């Protein structure tokens, strides 16, 4: 069965972080409570109760072995240490210095990493840069005839020749004349005389003279009347118009050599 002292010590151990000062209590009474205190809290209690510093060396030894066991493995002699409180402070400062150096290195490395990320970050552009555009396909004649004054001169010469050829063709087509047909009922003698008077040229088609003034539309009417006259029962034969000699019509063999051949 626990005594009142033991019950009070157990409650004080659970709430050791709330104890600020122990006053003049002897070390043997508060030792179980101080064993549960953290090193920083123990330093505060020792400053407020200086009589505890003489008896708290075993407590500091336990803190050193628990917090800096790896650092003390390099030390071969630990029995000659008298001030465990001072050793704990030195090791704590050394560890803090290492932590500060490591944190500075980590901070600088993180800053460099952020800068590299910013440099490699994809930024949308309104217009594609010229270096990233695909190369233009060269024109078929660009490799053989680069753009220069020679090309411009050749182009101008070609346009001049094309315009001159166009004018020649238009003049030839406008000067070409078509043959005139002889009206029916024209005598062969008049046609022969007319052909001799107006010789044919080498570049134009032969022209047929106009009918004389004496030849009027009455001749066509008489010819049509004779042609369309109905046959009577008394006369068995059908009246026909007078025949025209072949010399009246132009001889096609004369014009074959003068008419331009089709290509």
From Swiss-Prot:
Subunit details: Heterodimer with elc1. Component of a CRL3 E3 ubiquitin ligase complex consisting of a cullin, the linker protein elc1, the substrate receptor pof4/ela1, and the RING protein rbx1. Interacts with skp1.
Gene: pof4
GO cellular component: elongin complex
Organism: Schizosaccharomyces pombe (strain 972 / ATCC 24843) (Fission yeast)
Region (Disordered): 112-147, 170-263
Bias-annotated ranges (Low complexity): 230-245
Lineage: Eukaryota, Fungi, Dikarya, Ascomycota, Taphrinomycotina
Descriptive protein name: Elongin-A
Family recorded in the similarity comment: Belongs to the ELA1 family.
Described function: As part of the CRL3 E3 ubiquitin ligase complex; polyubiquitylates monoubiquitylated RNA polymerase II subunit rpb1 to trigger its proteolysis; plays a role in global genomic repair.
GO molecular function terms noted in the UniProt entry: transcription elongation factor activity
Pfam families, per database record: Elongin_A
InterPro entries (UniProt xref): Elongin-A_domain (IPR051870), RNA_pol_II_trans_fac_SIII_A (IPR010684)
GO terms (BP aspect): transcription elongation by RNA polymerase II; transcription initiation at RNA polymerase II promoter
PANTHER family with a match to the protein in the record: TRANSCRIPTION ELONGATION FACTOR B POLYPEPTIDE 3
Record field: compositional bias (Polar residues): 186-206, 214-229, 253-263
């Amino acid at each position: 069965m626990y005594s009142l002292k033991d019950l009070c010590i157990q409650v004080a151990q659970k709430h050791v972080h709330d104890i600020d000062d122990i006053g003049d209590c002897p070390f043997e009474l508060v030792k179980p409570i101080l064993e549960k205190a953290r090193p920083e809290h123990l330093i505060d209690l020792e400053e407020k109760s200086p009589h505890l510093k003489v008896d708290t060396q075993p407590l500091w030894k336990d803190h050193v072995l628990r917090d800096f066991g790896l650092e003390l493995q390099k030390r071969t002699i630990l029995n000659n240490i008298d001030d465990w409180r001072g050793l704990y402070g030195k090791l704590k400062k050394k560890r803090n210095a290492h932590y500060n150096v490591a944190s500075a290195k980590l901070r600088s490395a993180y800053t460099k990493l952020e800068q590299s990320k910013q440099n490699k970050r994809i930024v949308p552009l309104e217009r594609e840069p010229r270096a990233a555009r695909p190369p233009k396909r060269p024109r078929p004649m660009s490799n053989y005839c680069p753009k220069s004054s020679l090309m411009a001169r050749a182009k101008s010469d070609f346009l001049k020749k094309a315009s001159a050829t166009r004018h020649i063709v238009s003049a030839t087509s406008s000067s070409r004349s078509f043959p005139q047909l002889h009206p029916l009922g024209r005598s062969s003698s008049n046609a022969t005389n007319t052909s001799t008077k107006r010789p044919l040229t080498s570049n134009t088609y032969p022209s047929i003279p106009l009918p004389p003034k004496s030849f009027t539309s009455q001749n066509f009417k008489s010819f049509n009347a004779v042609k369309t006259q109905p046959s009577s029962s008394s006369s068995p034969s059908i009246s026909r118009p007078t025949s025209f000699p072949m010399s009246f019509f132009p001889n096609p063999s004369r014009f074959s050599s003068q008419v331009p051949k089709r290509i």
